[in-house]
Amino acid sequence: MGIFSIANQHIRFAVKLATAIVLALFVGFHFQLETPRWAVLTAAIVAAGPAFAAGGEPYSGAIRYRGFLRIIGTFIGCIAGLVIIIAMIRAPLLMILVCCIWAGFCTWISSLVRIENSYAWGLAGYTALIIVITIQPEPLLTPQFAVERCSEIVIGIVCAIMADLLFSPRSIKQEVDRELESLLVAQYQLMQLCIKHGDGEVVDKAWGDLVRRTTALQGMRSNLNMESSRWARANRRLKAINTLSLTLITQSCETYLIQNTRPELITDTFREFFDTPVETAQDVHKQLKRLRRVIAWTGERETPVTIYSWVAAATRYQLLKRGVISNTKINATEEEILQGEPEVKVESAERHHAMVNFWRTTLSCILGTLFWLWTGWTSGSGAMVMIAVVTSLAMRLPNPRMVAIDFIYGTLAALPLGLLYFLVIIPNTQQSMLLLCISLAVLGFFLGIEVQKRRLGSMGALASTINIIVLDNPMTFHFSQFLDSALGQIVGCVLAFTVILLVRDKSRDRTGRVLLNQFVFAAVSAMTTNVARRKENHLPALYQQLFLLMNKFPGDLPKFRLALTMIIAHQRLRDAPIPVNEDLSAFHRQMRRTADHVISARSDDKRRRYFGQLLEELEIYQEKLRIWQAPPQVTEPVHRLAGMLHKYQHALTDS
């Protein structure tokens, strides 16, 4: 396919984007808005953003959800801007500096919350800055400007949603159904690999792929939830399926690890049974029926606990899968499964990374302020806005540098494109609303195609072009003002890119160590006799951390294996029959405090000291278990955990 070719699957979204732009333009001028440009720009960004992220037409609900986040972010930013202006209107410089800190603060929060919701906080940061900068000539018009900006943005969002609904958005339900079938087959094949106990690298690749696919399925669940309320029952089932899928991975990998020391636990009966190849979900269904008969025949005591738990989880997975596909009413058996343990939310391991993002955004905005005041350039304010936009939106993404480059390319492409519209097209079409709409529809159509291809600079070009062409009411054509706006965008993006390069993010190793220590804490905290604590479901949170670790350190198998071993230890200790008495309960609390100190320690020396203390406490704990005559189901996992921590103590404590 050539660079300028148009694929059939890209046409529908391109028409959808063009329609959103035209609707926003028409409504903006019809209601005599002062700057319809904001409505058009909002419609374009809300519609095109999910398409750029997805690399194609977004699924149903994605545009609505992004629009909802944009409304929330805009209102938070407007309120913050009004508060800052009211409090500091007599000190303009201090007011702008506080706005720069506010933008950094919002970026810091956006780095800690769920990535789907980070967009709202990034938007809140630069919206306040836009308001403060824009009202500098006439500060008394602040409330009016804030209300107008909110109105224009809401109109743009409504137009984007209307265009999305008009062109029948894609439903993700069929993709979810197919993935559920395929994932079950992959889970069975992973168990086959683990029972064969073959090449470790093949097993590592298999479970790593399954972790990614399970995480992707969770993302599909979020999309399905946004799509329509009629999928509420399917959404509940999918949430439980996420935990079941992670349980299947854990039990399979534990089966593999057990055979490193005690291969005799997996009898020939089960080895022969799992030799039968499977290709479809129907094959897995038949095998599971046979496997349940085998377990009923051999008895629970003669069945390895990992295989028994795996079969139970796979059976529940199958039951819920059928319910998701049919979307029927939840029956009593399913309700019992869905009334599972409450999920635990863990503290973010990226606090240092979030602080780096805070300083990047704050310093770049302050640098823009100094540049504006030093040069006295009329478009210095425009440069500041672009700095805030780039840093606020780029920081949460995996590669902020490439996002900044995308904006630079986009603003450079917007200069000749905007020049064509400013000098030729708009002056010749402003007398006809139809021609003006057609001209912008053409722009939206072709850039909509490029956005779906994720062409470098396409998203930035779309937003920057709309931002600099004259879409005000009434239209005025001042070439110097156009040129200043275009150059201001470019300078702002370059300054933001410079700050991103200068303020290096060296938090990766620290984040990795914090993640590993959080796995240790989870394993230690599983040693408890508290009934409520034992019922807590840590598995989704632990695998979410593992997924983050895999993204931060691609290809680092020792780290992945260590993390997975800690997850397995947590699950085994959580179900272990620990003797209930006050002596052990008090020692459990002491070990949790020590493990927490390991995570929160700010220096390597303190971390090593607390980690050494934790190892000593584990030795004492093993002695206590012997005194209280704990069964092997307790002593063996604790012994394995202590051995793992001794083996990897340098990786868990050194920066």
Curated annotation (Swiss-Prot):
Cystine pairs = none
Membrane-crossing residues?
Answer: 13-33, 38-58, 69-89, 93-113, 121-141, 152-172, 370-390, 407-427, 431-451, 459-479, 482-502
Manganese recorded as keyword: no
Q: Which domain of life is it from?
A: Bacteria
Secretion signal: which residues? none
Q: How does it sit in the membrane?
A: Multi-pass membrane protein
Record keyword Cell inner membrane present: yes
Q: Name one GO biological process term.
A: carboxylic acid transport
Q: What does this protein do?
A: Forms an efflux pump with AaeA. Could function as a metabolic relief valve, allowing to eliminate certain compounds when they accumulate to high levels in the cell.
Name the family.
Belongs to the aromatic acid exporter ArAE (TC 2.A.85) family.
Name this protein carries in UniProt: p-hydroxybenzoic acid efflux pump subunit AaeB
Q: Please name the gene that encodes this protein.
A: aaeB
